[in-house]
């Protein structure tokens, strides 16, 4: 299967090179590699290899580097990383704009997908009425015992993502809503740890509150985001508010080093055209989190199965 996928991609690369693009010579892209960061959630890593594969199809060189999901914007600004392809508004918007204000990083456009990053529960928790009143946040006041675990000190547990993602955003919210006497926020070490906990809870039929996001592979299984007080500008503690508000529906952007349009004009033009939908991003994540493929193999399969999506971006 992998041999077939590699052959498909090689054929695609040859077709692109012969079919009027003339590869990197016509684009006059630099021989220096495009540095693409990888973070710690599946869609981002698969998409890194998908975009890298598209760049390689026009003859460009690509390198992948692990990078902190907040500090990456400084790395792009300083030229250590070339692009960021999943800039989530709620989590990374502030870091992105702070870097832009300093100079050296540019906005390369939005994906078609809109985003939500929020606490929620698997749909069966609502469907089976394990906590009557969900997904309204007020229901949590009377359901702490449903979400208690061995490590939650008798309180309901809220499983957040790694603390590097949001800092104390969720603990601050729980405190502002007066729920801190009934719930404790625990930080997962990785996205994989969240998925493992969700799978375990589903198998046991027990209640669980976790951080999650859309687009993601969980969209297909059913996941209900808790309806917290509406987000408004300035509602978070960092912006002068009390921190009780939920998360906004946001954009999903792309960012690039300011030299990228000059050093790799063809690749940069392609990058500005790239726009993934919610379903496409969910598919990328599902190949890893459900089908248990490696990130690299998932990207090869996605590229082979979706030539009609990405090839037009190269023309």
Task: Give the residues covered by each predicted segment.
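Short, well-ordered beta-strand elements
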Residues: 29-43, 60-65, 155-159, 271
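A conserved helix-loop-strand patch within extracytoplasmic ligand-binding domains
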Residues: 104-159
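A bilobed periplasmic-binding-protein/Venus flytrap-type ligand-binding module shared by bacterial periplasmic
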Residues: 117-130, 250-263, 286-287
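C-terminal functional modules
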Residues: 268-315
